[in-house]
């Protein structure tokens, strides 16, 4: 998967018209050059209708899928039939998939949970215990709810797995790159040294600035203490 921070330059290499294609995206974050979510970018720049864009969300770490451990996916698309077809194609004995029509909200959620996972990692690296982290994650889901409601108002249950579930697994899992990155920062690593040692991309690093700018550029800002702290 190409990280969102590098999507713009990679997509510019395309030589074929993708207007009539069905796009299934597992990329999490904002494309910096346009300030758009990945689905919005495909819609606005490549004129692909939202009915032909699907977003994959968790809670689902690839490492556990590779081990064939019971995992859960959310496929979000404006077209429920396409969403169900993708869900059926990805389902197996150990992968369960459900569908959602909240493509924008889910995209924001998968972006934000990476930021909150960095915060959880920083707290762990600083030696804060489970008591503190439980409060941190409780506050994170409330902050996520405020942010998503501000950016895309519609009826949604933020406690569903695509939002709360994905936040929890990313915030607590040993497989979470963003938590690992935050943990290293909390232990005193610089951003550059942490990135070099991990040799993997922590999407939350890029998402933090994007989320902050989205809120700052909004006519009615919302209170985002965790994002601002990260």
Task: For each feature predicted by the language model, list its residue ranges.
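NAD(P)-dependent Rossmann-like dehydrogenase/reductase catalytic/cofactor-binding core
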Residues: 113, 120-124, 128, 149-230
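Rossmann-like NAD(P)(H) cofactor-binding subdomain of soluble oxidoreductases
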Residues: 1-68, 86
